[in-house]
Amino acid sequence: MIQIEDKLISAEVVEELFHCDIIACKGACCVEGDLGAPLEIAELDILDSIYEKVKPYLRPEGIAAIEAQGKSVLDFTHSYSTPLVNEKECAYVTFDEKGIANCGIEQAWSAGDIAFRKPVSCHLYPIRIREYRDVEVLNYDRWDICSAACSLGVKKGIPVYEFVKDALIRKYGEEFYETLDSIVKEKMLMEQQDWEDEDNDED
């Protein structure tokens, strides 16, 4: 674990390698699972306020689900999340001609129609945040549908925390990310020095 103020970052977040391979998985994380995207309380009002600008990007079935269930729902974990279409994909999901899932909210953001990119939990994935009384814990969420992302991460040599750099800065700020990155780099240098010392001792 790495601790930065009241944030605890699991070792897997900095050690495991990951890079989304959207061509391979087709955005399965937006489709699979029992719940929609976790939402922060502040995001509930945001979704309400941007809905009319996001709506033109959504599928008819997504619009129907949102207007029947609400822009957000209180799920069985007693937390807020995005609504689902027929208990499957997120209601804000769109699909391109290749069947790849995209985020309608992010499409509206990319077009310059809104300032909100997408729920921060989506932006941070595969990191999931658990909030406790005094700390927030950042964990790496392993999911078999992301096996291609793990392989691509190894190929590119990108650890989880670097892959979600923009999201971490969005959530916690530039200083938090730079501190985390410095700690990781320093740890790597120390480990490399230890290996070199061991090699010298063997010689």
Task: Give the residues covered by each predicted segment.
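Short loop/turn segments that flank or connect secondary-structure elements
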Residues: 1-203
